Amino acid sequence: MTTDTTGRTGNPAATASPDRFRYGFLKGNPQLTKNGELKHLLSIEGLPRSIVNHILDTAEQFVSVTDREVKKVPLLRGKSVFNLFFENSTRTRTTFEIAATRLSADVLNLNINASSTSKGESLLDTINNLSAMHADLFVVRHASSGAPYLIAEHCAPHVHVINAGDGRHAHPTQGLLDMYTIRHYKRDFTKLRVAIVGDILHSRVARSDIHALTTLGVPEVRAIGPRTLLPGGLEQMGVKVFHNLDEGLKGVDVIIMLRLQNERMSGALLPSAQEYFKTWGLTPERLALAAPDAIVMHPGPMNRGVEIDSQVADGPQSVILNQVTFGIAVRMAVMGIVAGNSD
């Protein structure tokens, strides 16, 4: 048994089964106040549809801010946002930093490699010390599933926590920006067929997307990938599972491609990247099997020639770069909702 950065033995998500779709540490809904308001954003799982729609509606208001000469609103003026990235992600950290800055917050990016956790201090000791510096909001990315929940349970009452990705478990703001992108282009969730393709087993994005899609009433969600890269429990969520890409893509309105997360794999689950592309890569020919107006999405980073062809990634049906743009507005909305009305 090992001791993790929390200072406790085992994993913060000790009851989680990495091969299953659901995680065992999700007991109750610690994200909501007694009045049903959003205090933390830890997972899309368990969020009422009304809150998800409220976030998307608020994000729509913030999209116009990016087009203004002065790209700032005073919603978080005087608030301190700490970006705590225990796992690297330049793209996600940067968009959170931009979002907080546009809300007029003071932003601190903690250099984890130089922090006390690398000197043996526990995660909770680090959080308690940062809370003593009058932080208002922690944006947390961690390699251990459940770490943001642990922080939310133990941080000071006035502090809010946003999960920026924890292990295989969840990436709620990516899921929300994906939903915003789909709504922007397709409007009505209740008439869509959405395909998620690739390494779903290791993907926190896939889990967040599936919870969001089912919450918003999408009638048909498809999971497409090799048997070795699909978790159990998908069918219980109402997801249709396909082990043939061509069959799975027929008639879909939205395609969400996922990269191979080799850093989370143990053992040889797949042949070479070239063989993977041959069987599972999205090419123009395969895209033609989808609905004529289908859109192509990808949470990034992309591996061209592995899960997606460059002609598709750069083609007219790709909305991948717009996902990045919308992501700033969605993260502004989340931060504004959880921390904007705090005393």
From Swiss-Prot:
L-aspartate binds at residues 119, 204, 259. Its EC number is 2.1.3.2. InterPro entries: Asp/Orn_carbamoyltranf_P-bd, Asp/Orn_carbamoylTrfase, Asp/Orn_carbamoylTrfase_sf, Asp_carbamoyltransf, Asp_carbamoyltransf_Asp/Orn-bd. The keyword Transferase applies. Pathway: Pyrimidine metabolism; UMP biosynthesis via de novo pathway; (S)-dihydroorotate from bicarbonate: step 2/3. Belongs to the aspartate/ornithine carbamoyltransferase superfamily. ATCase family. This is Aspartate carbamoyltransferase catalytic subunit. Catalyzes the condensation of carbamoyl phosphate and aspartate to form carbamoyl aspartate and inorganic phosphate, the committed step in the de novo pyrimidine nucleotide biosynthesis pathway. Residues 1-20 are annotated as: Disordered. Residues 1-14 have a biased composition (Polar residues). It comes from Burkholderia lata (strain ATCC 17760 / DSM 23089 / LMG 22485 / NCIMB 9086 / R18194 / 383). It holds the Pfam family OTCace. Heterododecamer (2C3:3R2) of six catalytic PyrB chains organized as two trimers (C3), and six regulatory PyrI chains organized as three dimers (R2). It comes from the Bacteria. One of its GO terms (molecular function) is amino acid binding. Keywords: Pyrimidine biosynthesis, Transferase. NCBIfam families: asp_carb_tr, PRK00856.1. One of its GO terms (cellular component) is cytosol. Carbamoyl phosphate binds at residues 91-92, 141, 171, 174, 300-301. One of its GO terms (biological process) is 'de novo' UMP biosynthetic process. It catalyses: carbamoyl phosphate + L-aspartate = N-carbamoyl-L-aspartate + phosphate + H(+). Coiled coil: none annotated.
